[in-house]
Amino acid sequence: MTQPPTVAAVLAAHSRVVEVGIGARPDVAAALAERGCAVTATDIEACTVPETVRFVRDDVTDPERAVYEAADAVYALRCPPELQRAVVDVAGAVGAACYLTTLGGEPVVVPVSERRTVASGALFVARDA
């Protein structure tokens, strides 16, 4: 039986990505950078990220558009319902695809075009590029 892909394997189809709300979990961003993606990570608090990942302090509810403009995908992992709309909006503003995972059993509160099974659970496609 074939194992589902990792989130990084799915997102690696994009060359420039922004992770919103990286917090203390840079694993996916690091894996994407290892696959050759240009990765920018954002959070409202200062975070430690691998040298291969660019970090920018930003609040997605009041985003600095320049942080996202070059991205062809914006994603948020363990994204709480109250931030989902802001993540989708910033992706839409720059013409980027948008992917979300949720926290445990929390719902997706934005429209999604696809639910992909990944090794860690579900990856929701909230916006195609």
UniProtKB/Swiss-Prot annotation:
Listed Gene3D superfamilies: Vaccinia Virus protein VP39
Highest taxon of source: Archaea
InterPro entries registered for this protein in UniProt: SAM-dependent_MTases_sf, UPF0146
Family under the similarity heading: Belongs to the UPF0146 family.
Protein name, as recorded: UPF0146 protein VNG_2609C
